[in-house]
Design a protein with these regions (language model features):
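Phosphate- and other anionic-substrate recognition elements at nucleic-acid/protein interfaces
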Residues: 1-4, 17-204
Length: 204
């Protein structure tokens, strides 16, 4: 996935510039070790889309669900701590690179919602019903921590309904705003991209 040029058809340069000066919003659709990031202006124009790395090369992307299975709880906890530290370094670097390349300051980041009372104890995380979600939650927490460290607001969204929520906010503009990027920017424009853009709209 590559970053894109601003999507500004139908808007004057002064209006686009004013919207960008107001700040841009980032929507994230994360996976294990990487994420799709879509950045939009206050007027919901896509100014950047890219894949970002959330973990360093060579580190296990899903320690709880896979790599820690043969380990005892103490060894599993050490492995998860190493992976989390790697994720923090990689995510910080990815977000700093993103922020440095944008035409305006980032004001918020939108992330998929996760249970805020998710257990911290690794021994508990290794048991059902937590083990299938623990690694994903770790990435959410790392992304959130990185955003707060940079002074960005953090918004949480539900992946199943965020597109409908965005359409409700946009009203008659929904088809144009949500459908235009695929036509004007070309591939890649996947479900992850649509969800990420919708999340920035709901956060605005």
């Amino acid at each position: 996935m590559t970053q894109t040029s601003p999507q500004g058809e139908g808007r004057g340069p002064h209006e686009q510039g004013r919207e960008i000066l107001e700040g841009v919003r980032v929507g994230i659709a994360h996976h294990l070790g990487w994420a799709v990031a879509v950045t939009a202006s206050a007027g919901h124009e896509v100014v950047d889309r890219r894949r970002i790395e959330l973990i360093e090369p060579g580190m296990p992307a899903a320690p709880i669900e896979h790599d820690a299975k043969p380990l005892d709880d103490a060894a599993a906890a050490r492995l998860v701590a190493e992976v989390r530290a790697s994720a923090l370094r990689a995510t910080s670097a990815s977000l700093d690179q993103l922020a440095a390349s944008l035409p305006g300051p980032i004001v918020s980041m939108s992330l998929r919602a996760w249970p805020l009372d998710f257990p911290d104890d690794i021994a508990v995380q290794r048991r059902p019903p937590y083990e299938s979600r623990a690694d994903s939650v770790m990435y959410c927490q790392v992304l959130s921590d990185c955003a707060y460290e940079r002074g960005w607001q953090v918004h949480l969204y539900g992946a199943k309904d965020v597109e409908a929520q965005a359409a409700g906010i946009l009203g008659e503009r929904a088809g144009d705003v949500l459908g235009r990027p695929r036509a004007t920017l070309g591939p890649p424009w996947t479900k992850d991209h649509r969800i990420s853009l919708a999340a920035t709209i709901v956060a605005s």
